[in-house]
């Protein structure tokens, strides 16, 4: 896509705001002066639109209905993007906090749904069989309080549940944020001890469980 720029001040900085050709042809914009600087406020109708985060449609469905994933998709072999989420005790947790360990990262829409409940219990069971250098993280948009309550009721000991509700840091960095619902898609990522993505599984239908055997196979092959 061709880059579009509008100069908004006398400083030598071009800010990608809107397609200039469309702006010149449109009367639907207002330019205001704020503290001596020109700040364009542009109302656009189609055509050249801002694309802050990449969007993917048709990758996954929710009960058969296609949804839009936003963020930056990750690929096997790339350095795993760092992110910051919130633990049950409200402390900040980053992926880099687990440097030197293999991480299984499972994103789910909500622990309060039956499929997410089943999935997290299954990973909790499997995590108990893995070595101490492997950690399992389950990330959702649930509030930390709700996650803590659920873990207590379900007896979850081997999986760390983390909340992405504050900044959507994980969902944006891994391309699994559902635009229409502000929930995370069902996906599983395996990151090795060197911080490299070794496995990616985006579950096509959110209402179904992931392929556990494929995830465990990827971990055991590291």
Each model region followed by its residue ranges:
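Bacterial N-terminal signal peptides
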Residues: 35-44
